[in-house]
């Protein structure tokens, strides 16, 4: 959980170990967020979440999954243009 004085990450990447599509998505999200100045974090769906329960039931068959501002924006093969558009849309609403 991020410290209370820092905003939550705008982009969340849900992954699992040994997933080659997750490796590709991580590289894409890292690059796009760096270029756009957006925060991001990665969540392993096989590890216990904040409530102690892994997220594998919700995300397991879809990984990698990208959410921007809490909205699912892609899964399996992540589209860079959709991620950028979601970040731009969120910035306009701020």
Question: How should these model regions be labeled?
Answer:
Residues 1-10, 34-37, 85-94:
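Short, low-complexity, intrinsically disordered N-terminal peptides in bacterial proteins
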Residues 2-32:
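Local sequence-structure signature of Cys/Sec-based thiol-disulfide redox active-site neighborhoods
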Residues 23-26, 52, 80:
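Conserved strand-to-helix beginnings and helix N-cap segments that scaffold or border functional pockets
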Residues 38-50:
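Thiol-based oxidoreductase modules, predominantly thioredoxin-like and allied folds used
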Residues 48-58:
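N-terminal beta-loop-helix "entrance" segment that forms/cooperates
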Residues 57-66:
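Structural micro-motif
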Residues 68-94:
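Non-catalytic, surface beta->alpha helical segment in thiol-disulfide oxidoreductase systems
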């Amino acid at each position: 959980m991020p410290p209370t004085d820092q905003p939550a990450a705008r982009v969340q990447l849900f992954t699992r170990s040994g997933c080659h599509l997750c490796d590709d998505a991580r590289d894409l999200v890292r690059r796009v967020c760096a270029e756009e100045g957006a925060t991001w974090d990665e969540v392993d769906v096989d590890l216990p979440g904040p409530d102690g329960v892994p997220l594998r039931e919700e995300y397991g068959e879809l990984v990698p999954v990208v959410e921007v501002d809490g909205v699912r924006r892609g899964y399996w093969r992540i589209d860079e243009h959709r991620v950028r558009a979601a970040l731009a849309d969120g910035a306009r609403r701020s």
